[in-house]
């Protein structure tokens, strides 16, 4: 009885870690898509500022991707 409840709790913990990694990936994908779309709108409005907009877009996307990578690594360490 006790062993089965411990195994069930461990399984739920692994499921939670996997869901956390999945949500982090989905959130990063949506965030980077939003960044790209907004940057394209801004470049369409002001083509002369495309260099600065593109630089800021790449930096912001890198920060979002870095946060997502940290979340995925943390979830991977917690799964064991």
Where on the chain are the PLM-derived regions?
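Hydrophobic, small-residue-rich transmembrane alpha-helices and their short perimembrane loops
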Residues: 1-80
């Amino acid at each position: 009885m006790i062993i089965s409840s411990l195994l069930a709790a461990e399984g739920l913990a692994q499921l939670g870690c996997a869901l956390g990694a999945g949500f982090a990936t989905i959130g990063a994908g949506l965030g980077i898509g939003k960044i790209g779309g907004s940057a394209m709108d801004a470049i369409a409005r002001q083509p002369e500022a495309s260099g600065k907009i593109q630089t800021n877009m790449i930096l912001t996307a890198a920060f979002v991707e870095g946060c997502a990578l940290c979340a995925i690594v943390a979830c991977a360490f917690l799964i064991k």
